[in-house]
Amino acid sequence: SHQDCYEALHKCMASHSKPFSCSMKFHMCLQQQ
């Protein structure tokens, strides 16, 4: 679900210093729905 993508995005942002890579993964996640 999209909610899973949002949760994964927040976890990524919290644990990584590369927001760009997090948002790329987020958009790929949304496209897979």
UniProtKB/Swiss-Prot annotation:
Q: Which GO terms describe its biological process?
A: defense response to bacterium; defense response to fungus; killing of cells of another organism
Q: Which residues cross the membrane?
A: none
Coiled-coil region: none
| Post-translational modifications reported in the UniProt record | Contains two disulfide bonds. Up to two of the methionines may be oxidized to methionine sulfoxides.
- Gene Ontology cellular component terms for the protein in this record: extracellular region
Keywords from the UniProt entry: Antibiotic, Antimicrobial, Disulfide bond, Fungicide, Secreted
Q: Where in the cell is it found?
A: Secreted
Domain of life of the organism encoding this protein: Eukaryota
> What is its biological role?
Has antibacterial activity against Gram-negative bacteria E.coli JM109 and DH5-alpha, H.influenza IID 983, and V.vulnificus RIMD 2219009. Has antibacterial activity against Gram-positive bacteria S.aureus IID 1677, B.subtilis RIMD 0225014 and L.monocytogenes VIU206. Possesses antifungal activity against S.cerevisiae A581A, S.pombe IFO 1628, C.albicans ATCC 36232 and TIMM-1623, and C.tropicalis TIMM-0313.
* Protein name listed in UniProt: Dolabellanin-B2
